[in-house]
Regions:
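Conserved ATP-binding TGD loop and adjacent catalytic N/P-domain core of P-type ATPases
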Residues: 1, 281, 288, 362, ...
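Conserved cytosolic catalytic loops of P-type ATPases
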Residues: 28-46, 50, 220-222, 251-346, ...
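Transmembrane helix-loop-helix hairpins at the membrane interface
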Residues: 102-260, 372, 473, 744
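Membrane-embedded alpha-helical bundles of multi-pass transporters
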Residues: 128-143, 172, 176, 191, ...
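Soluble-to-membrane junctions at the N-terminal ends of transmembrane alpha-helices
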Residues: 91-114, 166-189, 353-386, 402, ...
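Juxtamembrane coupling segments of multi-pass membrane pumps/enzymes
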Residues: 200, 204, 209-211, 226-288, ...
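ATP-driven catalytic headpiece of P-type ATPases
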Residues: 107, 329, 453-502, 532-611, ...
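Flexible metal-binding regulatory segments at protein termini and peripheral loops
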Residues: 1-146, 156, 243, 269-272, ...
Length: 779
């Protein structure tokens, strides 16, 4: 399978989006289509053996729109995500496109208003009692009034010709859009007005001067057509401006990337180059205050790096030789050199931007209902408008009243409000998530997370740091009560025995010794005893390190209950012996993260059941669980990596929606099995297989924040869908005159156009409220 992105031109409303989707979905070999109305783009998964990008573009063209490939022939991974696409940071962002559209629309709007003001004044002045020049009030000059209105209308029609071109084109293709509603409504007003002018001409020719003036006053709708076009443009302009703000998070990420960087040659000379020209393996220098241009590994120097743009973590991270640095993070203090490892589309920044854009290109399940409604909305509105015209003619016999209501129905209807409700909120929600270091890979993941009833936490690397550390150093006591050796001597003994071991516990002990400046001595006759520990000889001394079983086999007495006490605290004790006597104990534990207990409390406050899954024995697992506020019933212990997926499935079979949180190292099957998989603390490796959501930081609180953001986003979408349906449900009958017997009031097409424009603006504005989202469970 391949996945391509296409730029799609000519889409103006939700109906357009639905038509493009249908046209491409019908092609053989197309697996899925996701059309993004906001970005004017389309993401297509297809079989290259059955259909080509040219075939897809042709299908879009036949539907009445234009399409061109942005990326082609990209192979997709098993999870469907694109690999090796062009660097997102170097693509034109949707925000830039929308700003360009808004700029052109502003020019159209200014011209429209310049001509609309005199047109409206002249056309409505006689009804509102406004003073008018005698040339427009004298009965003998009634044709002058009509011709002046027509001349003022022509520039408005000219600058807004896109409504007519796109609208009638959609009618020809049998797929009417919102532009068709505007085009037919405005055309009907203009056509009736032109017909009235011919009647006026006949009346003037027959000397019926007064009748001609009355015909003009009652039947000229040029100002209505001009007002409809201008108000729709006002609404479109405001809508486009608002939509351009929804992509602010992506735009901010793109702007973080520096344009130039400093390359350090082998002879030490430094040269400023464009970031696009950097190759993996090159050495670069970064000075205080500069943004890091690409991903890499520090070679010399040290500094504090601000990674908040990528992870949301406000505290700068200390970096020294051997540490990784990422593009778009900011060097705060010292100067350092680093070797480039990932450039262009492979950097963390580019991958984050691509993830956010891919999420925006997908559809949330909640959008399907709106898409179905939008697909049939316009034809239904045309039918209602026709019925309205016929009904008014039958009841009143007045073409004016029938035309007024029929046109009002056309222009008040707004499929855009329905179509915008979901994609705008998804774009703002995923963008806000990116700002917080929470990356949703799809709109479906964003929606599904709100329904999660159980969160399963993988212990190692999720609840705990995933890196064992020394917690206790206990020196043994001789029979006379004196210490067997000093604490430093015990650590020297431990270092000598553990320096050759690759066991994680040995690494923890060596790290502690390094911190204290203790250098490991050389030993002889080193031997590993499987499942027990190690033995060796240091000079004339026989030394050993291991568990209780090894000590027992060596005839060394260990104080009763000591091993059990450490195990109950979630610690692993290592016993050290010298010449047949116990020298001391060093306890090692995988430390619990500072925020894990707070995160468990936060998840409970959201009504979520929390479970911990681990391969540790139950005693150790329950000790960790107690420290974070979990009961023994909420612990699933002694689980092999291959069995984690089975335990998640069992929870699902019990009727729970499950979110699995892990580091993506040995729990990928469980992440994939869960209703929502969250990979935590992945840093630069953001494309974890199986994960639906990537949490950039190692903070478990982000799980609670992600659930809150999901709920806030879907709540926002439901609000918009409700008001869009409510607006159309009330507005269309009102325009048709259903309430006329009660109110005695007939809705003007001009008010209908204003209401239609405001409805879309309101939907977008409501979605923009998500930009100020703050989780209630924040620290």
């Amino acid at each position: 399978m391949a996945q391509d992105t296409f730029d799609v031109g000519g889409m103006t409303c939700a109906a357009c989006q639905a038509h493009v989707d249908r046209a491409v979905s019908k092609l053989d070999g197309v697996q899925s289509v996701a059309v993004n109305l906001l970005a004017g783009s389309m993401l297509v998964d297809y079989d290259p053996a059955q259909v080509s990008p040219d075939d897809i573009c042709t299908a879009v063209d036949r539907a009445g729109y234009s399409a061109s490939p942005v990326s082609t022939g990209t192979e997709t991974a098993p999870n469907g995500s694109a690999q090796a696409r062009s660097g997102a940071a170097h693509m034109e962002s949707p925000t830039k496109k929308l700003e360009a559209v808004a700029s052109a629309m502003r020019t159209r709007l200014i011209i429209s208003i310049i001509f609309l003001i005199p047109l409206f004044y002249i056309g409505m002045g006689h009804m509102l009692g406004w003073p008018l020049p005698s040339v427009f009030t004298d009965h003998t000059h009634s044709m002058t009034l009509a011709l002046t209105e027509l001349v003022l209308l022509i520039p408005i029609v000219y600058v807004n010709d896109a409504y007519f071109i796109n609208g009638f084109k959609s009618l020809v293709h049998g797929a009417p859009t919102m532009d068709a509603l505007i085009a037919v409504g405005a055309t009907a007003s203009i056509a009736w007005s032109l017909y009235a002018m011919f009647i006026m001409a006949d009346q003037l020719a027959a000397g019926q001067i007064h009748e001609a003036m009355m015909t003009g006053m009652d039947n000229l709708y040029f100002e209505s057509a001009g007002t409809i076009l201008s108000l729709v443009t006002v609404g479109k302009y405001l809508e486009t401006r608002s939509k351009s703000k929804t992509g602010g998070a992506i735009e901010a990420l793109i702007d973080l990337a520096p344009k130039t960087a400093t390359i350090v040659a082998d002879d030490g000379t430094e040269t400023a180059v464009e970031v696009d020209s950097i190759l993996p393996g090159q050495v670069l220098r970064v000075r205080p205050g500069e943004s890091i241009p690409v991903d890499g590994v520090v070679l010399e120097g040290s500094s504090a790096v601000d990674e908040s743009a990528l992870t949301g973590e406000s505290i700068p991270v200390e970096k020294t030789a051997g540490d990784t640095v990422n593009a778009a993070t900011v060097n705060r203090t010292g100067s350092f050199t680093f070797r480039a490892t990932r450039v262009g589309a492979d950097t963390s920044l580019a991958k984050i931007i691509q993830l956010v854009e891919d999420a925006n290109a997908t559809k949330a399940p909640i959008a399907r209902m709106a898409d179905k409604v939008a697909g049939v909305f316009v034809p239904v509105v045309f039918a209602i408008s026709a019925v309205t015209f016929v009904a008014w003619m039958a009841l009143t016999g007045s073409v004016n009243e029938a035309l007024t209501s029929a046109v009002a129905v056309l222009v008040i209807s707004c499929p855009c409000a329905l179509g915008l409700a979901t994609p705008v909120a998804i774009m703002v929600g995923t963008g806000k998530g990116a700002e917080m270091g929470i990356l949703f890979k799809s709109a479906e993941a964003l929606e599904n997370l709100r329904n999660v009833g159980t969160v399963v936490l993988d212990k190692t690397g999720t609840v705990t740091r995933g890196k064992p550390a020394v917690t206790d150093i206990v020196v043994a006591t001789r029979t006379d009560g004196s210490p067997a050796m000093s604490e430093k001597a015990l650590l020297k003994l431990a270092a000598a025995l553990e320096r050759q071991s690759e066991h994680p516990l040995a690494e923890a002990i060596m790290a502690e010794c390094e911190t204290r400046g203790i250098v490991a001595r050389m030993v002889e006759d080193f031997a590993a005893v499987p499942g027990r520990g190690v033995t060796a000889r240091e000079g004339q001394n026989v030394i050993a390190a291991g568990n209780v079983r090894l000590m027992s086999e060596l005839g060394i007495t260990v104080p009763a209950g000591l091993a059990e006490r450490f195990a109950a605290e979630g610690k692993t004790p290592l016993f050290f012996a010298k010449n047949g006597e116990l020298a001391g104990i060093v306890a090692v534990a995988d430390e619990v993260k500072e925020t894990s207990a707070e995160a468990v409390t936060a998840l409970r406050s959201l009504g979520v059941d929390v479970r911990m899954l681990t391969g540790d024995n139950r005693v150790t697992a329950e000790a960790i669980a107690r420290r974070v506020g979990l009961t023994s019933e909420q612990v699933i212990a002694d689980v092999l990596p291959a069995d984690k997926e089975r335990h998640v499935r069992e929870l699902q079979d019990a009727g729970s929606k499950v979110a699995m949180v892990g580091d993506g190292i040995n729990d990928s099957p469980a992440l994939a099995r869960a209703d929502v998989g969250l990979a935590i603390g992945t840093g630069a490796d953001i494309a974890k297989e199986g994960a639906d959501v990537v949490l950039m930081r190692s903070d478990l609180m982000d799980v609670a924040h992600a659930i809150e953001l999901s709920r806030a986003t879907i709540r926002n979408i439901k609000q918009d869908l409700f008001w869009a349906l409510f607006y159309n449900g009330i507005g269309i009958p009102l325009a048709a005159g259903v309430f006329f017997p009660l109110t005695g009031w007939q809705l003007s097409p001009m008010f209908g156009a204003a209401a239609m424009s405001l409805s879309s603006v309101c939907v977008v504005s409501n979605a923009l409220r998500l930009k100020s989202f703050k989780p209630k469970t924040a620290h």
